[in-house]
Curated annotation (Swiss-Prot):
Keywords: Ribonucleoprotein, Ribosomal protein. This is Large ribosomal subunit protein uL30. One of its GO terms (molecular function) is structural constituent of ribosome. CDD domains: Ribosomal_L30 (cd01658). The lineage of its organism: Bacteria, Bacillati, Actinomycetota, Actinomycetes, Mycobacteriales. Part of the 50S ribosomal subunit. Disulfide bonds: none annotated. PANTHER family: LARGE RIBOSOMAL SUBUNIT PROTEIN UL30M (PTHR15892:SF2), MITOCHONDRIAL RIBOSOMAL PROTEIN L30 (PTHR15892). NCBIfam families: rpmD_bact. The keyword Transferase does not apply. One of its GO terms (biological process) is translation.
């Protein structure tokens, strides 16, 4: 299973760690979407920035 992650809010005024997590997920701007594998590491990054993103489950790798 994979996760479709879309950034819905900007990073102005956020903590540096949150910006690092978004960059590690591959998100660069608002409405940018990436597909990442469903792993504990990715879930941890998602948990830290859940107020800035939307996550959907998709079939696939």
């Amino acid at each position: 299973m994979a996760l479709k992650i879309t950034q819905i809010k900007g990073t102005v005024g956020t903590k540096p760690k949150h910006r690092e997590n978004l960059r590690s997920l591959g998100l660069k701007r608002i409405r940018h979407t990436v597909i990442r594998p469903d792993t504990p590491e990715v879930r941890g990054m998602i948990l830290a920035v859940r107020h800035l993103i939307v996550v959907e489950e998709v079939a696939g790798e």
